Amino acid sequence: MSRVFVTGGTGVIGSALVTRLLERGDDVVGLARSDSAAETLEARGVRVVRGEGYDEDDLTRGMEGCAQAYNVAGVNALCVDDPRPMERMNVGGAVAAVRAAARAGVARLVHTSSAATIGEPPGTVGTELTPHRGWYLSTYERTKTEGERAALATSREVGQDLVLVNPSSVQGPGRAGGTGRILLAVLDGRLRFFVPTCVSLVDIDDCVAGHLLAAERGVAGERYLLTGMTLAIGDALALAAEVAGVQRKPRLLPRRVATVAAAVVERGFKIAGRRPPVCREMVRTLLHGHRYDGSRAERDLGLRYTDPRETIRKTVDWARAEGLIR
């Protein structure tokens, strides 16, 4: 049994990762910034260290005595007015984790980056070697990209073994936000309009397996895209409706209409002093779409991806059991 440190252990990816680590008998240490997070982790048998995911000293305390560490914590949001919390966690937290791992003597740190950092040009398929397009779709993409680059530079500076994993949109039990929220809204009949786009997805179990395989077989300083499928949004939603046994087919809005509508909604909500449910950044990201190639993780790590139908079936079964859809 080895001791392993995890940040973000109550999130979708982190919680599933903690489950796998506990199942294989690891002594898991988790960072918790709140009482509720600490209680959740302790109830699962995780040793808890209180602190912030961007504080190097807090992270060092948690990593002491650990052979491996997984820095999963991050902030993923759109339509935010103040980028500083995202910068502090996604950039500052990435650097702090690398420095803490070096101070604590961690043999390998796996950092959860994002497929968004690939920055593929419009209409192209992104790989780990794709040159970034040079401009950002969102604050999230910018901060995760800056965090990834800073983490790599810091790892070279301090001599820390670091492997990056870059999941695309994670789907499966527990995912009720982001694209998971869109899927559930369509299946429940609450979302009747959408935009034409493509989406790359990865099953939550495959995402966790990719993290574990990166720790075991990954090459230091390299990154591995974790993405098992790319679907046009119409095909993805049709498959979801078929699996769920419902008749759902959202109308796809013209790109121009979607862009103008987002600008109007964003301005109206900001005038009212409220956070908009839709904004230009969100629509810009959706209209760009994402197409990623996750075959390197298959070749180099031995990862095997789940069939899309099975991923959606698990998601639908979980959502129904939780009362999220009818």
Question: Where do the protein language model's features map onto the residues?
Answer:
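Substrate-positioning beta->alpha
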Residues: 96, 178, 195-215, 221-222
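Mid/C-terminal beta-alpha module of Rossmann-like enzyme folds, strongest
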Residues: 210-277, 294, 308-326
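Conserved Rossmann-fold NAD(P)-dependent oxidoreductase catalytic core, especially the SDR/UDP-sugar
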Residues: 89-140
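NAD(P)H-binding glycine-rich loop region in Rossmannoid oxidoreductase-like domains
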Residues: 36-42, 46-92, 100
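NAD(P)-dependent short-chain dehydrogenase/reductase
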Residues: 158-201
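Active-site Tyr-X1-5-Lys
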Residues: 137-163
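A hydrophobic C-terminal alpha-helical subdomain
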Residues: 191-195, 199, 206, 255-300, ...
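N-terminal Rossmann NAD(P)H-binding glycine-rich loop of SDR-like oxidoreductase domains
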Residues: 4-24
